[in-house]
UniProtKB/Swiss-Prot annotation:
Protein name, entry field: Transcriptional regulatory protein RXT3
Organism: Saccharomyces cerevisiae (strain ATCC 204508 / S288c) (Baker's yeast)
Lineage: Eukaryota, Fungi, Dikarya, Ascomycota, Saccharomycotina
InterPro entries membership: Rxt3
Keywords associated with the record: Acetylation, Chromatin regulator, Nucleus, Repressor, Transcription, Transcription regulation
GO cellular component terms given for this protein: nucleus; Rpd3L complex; Rpd3L-Expanded complex
Quaternary state and interactors: Component of the RPD3C(L) complex composed of at least ASH1, CTI6, DEP1, PHO23, RPD3, RXT2, RXT3, SAP30, SDS3, SIN3, UME1 and UME6.
Other remarks in the entry: Present with 3060 molecules/cell in log phase SD medium.
The keyword Translocase belongs to this UniProt entry's keyword annotation: no
Function: Component of the RPD3C(L) histone deacetylase complex (HDAC) responsible for the deacetylation of lysine residues on the N-terminal part of the core histones (H2A, H2B, H3 and H4). Histone deacetylation gives a tag for epigenetic repression and plays an important role in transcriptional regulation, cell cycle progression and developmental events.
Length: 294
């Protein structure tokens, strides 16, 4: 029996080692640049306020810290040459872990009694465990306007309150998907007179880093829902802390912590779906809440 047959994960670990070395080069480049800008006071990359807001329909030009993950994405595509397979659909919930199973309660039961079934303080990460065999595959995530609004307003949104987000462009799989969307530049309303051509709201899509279909409502408070494709990626040795779009992600992988024990993911595509009846709560027929209650 060959060594690879004895240890089927050996090839994966060898590939991971190469990814770690490649990522360290990118992190060192970003780290050197940011130390100059921050006086070595923090390992958090702070972007200028002007970058996070539109003024007269334009983005101000600044020499921003380079945290591009394109080399890691190209390496992943080379070593995991899967034809993108959709693993299924998940329905976002602020309080429980998602599941690809079909035998779950309906969306209308989300806030039914007893409320104590929810962990309103420290819910588990939303994304379920994804095996390494699914690296470079995608999953569809459906998010309602109410959940998006709760995150932006920090109301009944424990993952926002706990700032559960690690990394930049590529995030640990226990990062909250809505926080990841916000960290990539997604906003709840279209900027007045603004242009999206410089945004990178789908940074792990190597062919289109702003792969967004549909338009955000111009009228504030107009409800819409999202269908987001998540691309699963290998574990990174380190997830950097970066401040962007009013969200500061957290670092994981410093000397004081162990390597993350799950996969990574990023935003691959976004579909914006405006509701036809703005006053009607989002409870379409067949909308299934796939959740684990244990």
């Amino acid at each position: 029996m060959s060594v690879s047959e004895q240890d089927p994960n050996r090839a994966y670990r060898e590939t991971q080692s190469q990814i770690y070395k490649l990522q360290e080069t990118l992190l060192n480049s970003a780290r050197t640049k940011n130390k100059q800008e921050e006086g070595q006071e923090s390992n958090t990359h702070s972007f200028p306020e002007q970058y996070m807001h539109y003024q007269n329909g334009r983005n101000s030009a600044y020499d921003l810290p380079n945290v591009s993950s394109q080399s890691v994405l190209a390496f992943t595509e080379k070593h995991y040459p899967n034809k993108l397979k959709n693993l299924g659909t998940l329905y976002y919930n602020r309080f429980k872990e998602g599941s690809f199973d079909e035998d779950s309660t309906s969306y209308s039961d989300r806030h039914s009694f007893p409320y104590n079934l929810y962990d309103n303080t420290l819910p588990p990460p939303f994304l379920p465990a994804i095996g390494i065999q699914n690296i470079n595959n995608i999953a569809t995530l459906k998010i309602t306007y109410e959940d998006i609004q709760a995150s932006f307003n920090n109301i009944e949104s424990p993952r926002k309150r706990n700032n559960e987000i690690w990394g930049c462009d590529i995030y640990s799989d226990d990062s909250d998907p809505i926080l990841v969307l916000r960290h990539c530049g997604f906003k709840i309303g279209a900027p007045s007179g603004g242009s999206f051509h410089k945004l990178r709201r789908t940074p792990v899509n190597v062919t289109n880093q702003d792969n967004v279909t549909g338009n955000l409502p111009l009228l504030e408070g107009t409800p819409f829902d999202l269908e987001v494709e998540l691309l699963f990626l290998p574990t990174l040795q380190k997830y950097p802390s970066v401040k962007r779009f009013d969200i500061t992600s957290r670092e994981w992988g410093s000397e004081a912590t162990v390597i993350h024990d799950g996969l990574s993911y990023g935003i691959y595509s976004i579909v914006i779906k405006q509701r036809l009846d703005r006053d009607k709560p989002h409870e379409p027929n067949g909308y299934i809440k796939n959740l684990k209650w244990t």
